[in-house]
């Protein structure tokens, strides 16, 4: 057999070998080829809606503690405690509590579900009776979001909080300021600068203002005296 014949035979054998490999599913991947792995997110985001539904409970005078007393404009039987979910300043889901009038329970649940879905941050949320004498100043300095508290306004009339029809959100970073310079909380002077970008701040036209307004609630940030950035109410 000549050299040319050997080369032709080798070529034919090679072609048959290639066909056999193709019929068997193609050539094997090169040794050391990288494996494709789908990485899981290291910081998974919570679902758009709370995993746990809001829970509504009646309250009595004992449960309200120092936040209620005889002579308040509403009886404990008119109030409800809502346990609901919120996104904290740490970006995680938390459970908190608000006491509100029974007539606005549906509003409040819907509002905080909407704020949860857009991940608006709330630092903490607990009823004011957790603070000595249910002191509003202490709750505000703690940046605590709260609702019912039987307390009067400086004018002597009842605050809408005394009716369970008002909510204060992140009050340290959203302070109250009167024309005479009455600042609440007193530790919030730095946050009178509304160009700051601290989380939890509320600004005109933002998602918090729009969400409350859609349910007929008024924002104290629209008032002229006082200006109350933390405050939302429904009469």
Which residues fall in each region the model found?
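Secretory targeting and sorting signals
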Residues: 1-28
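Anion (oxyanion) recognition and catalysis
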Residues: 17, 116, 213
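N-terminal low-complexity, Pro/Thr-rich disordered segments
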Residues: 19-70
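Post-signal peptide N-terminal regions of Sec-secreted extracellular proteins
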Residues: 40-51, 74-75, 105, 213, ...
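N-terminal post-signal-peptidase region of extra-cytosolic proteins
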Residues: 63-70, 93-102, 108, 150-155
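Active-site acidic/histidine clusters and adjacent loop/turn architecture
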Residues: 74-140
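Active-site-adjacent loop/helix surface patches within enzyme catalytic domains
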Residues: 126-163, 176
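Catalytic cores and adjacent binding grooves of peptidoglycan-active enzymes
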Residues: 152-158, 163-235
